[in-house]
Design a protein with these regions (language model features):
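Bimodal "functional hotspot" detector
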Residues: 1-181
Length: 181
């Protein structure tokens, strides 16, 4: 690790992946490792050779891979103007364990990040997945302000409709906080 960049050297077994899974594997690797404190980017090697394309593709990659690459991407674009890229953390539950899954959404929007995050947490990200958000579609963000790196959000009373306070405190707060990070 040098200047926030972690260098990893893999053997050729990493190339044993289907072409259409290659990018997703790399995105997950980048997102997982840059979540660790002090790691801002990755440089990847395969048996001491710099990785210049996604495995089993011709798609070029930058020398230093960062979270700018996105993860689990959804595209909602109708032009190349005013494109925003926001990563929203949705919830997935398996048995009694709750996971927070990042989804990078690329869309045409002039809204700020807070408005985009709340808007997307009020909707379901994928029609056919187990990703959820406990933020109700009827919830309205009344007001927000940022003071000294702290975000204060005021919601309509509908925020608590049909949800236990425990679920509200944990899942909604964590999803919003991770998404605004």
């Amino acid at each position: 690790l040098q200047d926030g960049v972690l260098k990893l050297n893999f053997n050729k077994n990493i190339l044993n992946i289907k072409e259409n899974d290659s990018r997703k594997m790399m995105e997950c690797l980048i997102y997982s490792l840059t979540e660790l404190e002090g790691i801002k980017g990755l440089i990847l090697y395969i048996e001491d050779d710099l990785l210049r394309v996604f495995p089993n593709t011709n798609e070029k990659i930058p020398d230093v891979l960062t979270r700018d690459i996105g993860v689990n991407k959804l595209y909602n674009l109708n032009s190349f103007k005013n494109v925003s890229k926001t990563t929203i953390y949705y919830i997935s539950q398996k048995e009694d364990v709750t996971y927070y899954i990042p989804v990078t959404i690329l869309e045409n929007s002039e809204k700020d990040k807070i408005e985009i995050v709340i808007e997307h947490l009020k909707t379901n990200p994928y029609a056919k997945t187990n990703l959820i958000s406990y933020l109700k579609a009827s919830t309205e963000l009344s007001h927000y302000e940022i003071l000294e790196q702290t975000v204060y959000l005021s919601f309509s009373p509908l925020l608590y409709e049909g949800i236990s306070k425990e679920d509200m405190l944990e899942t909604v707060k964590f999803s919003i906080a991770l998404s605004l990070k």
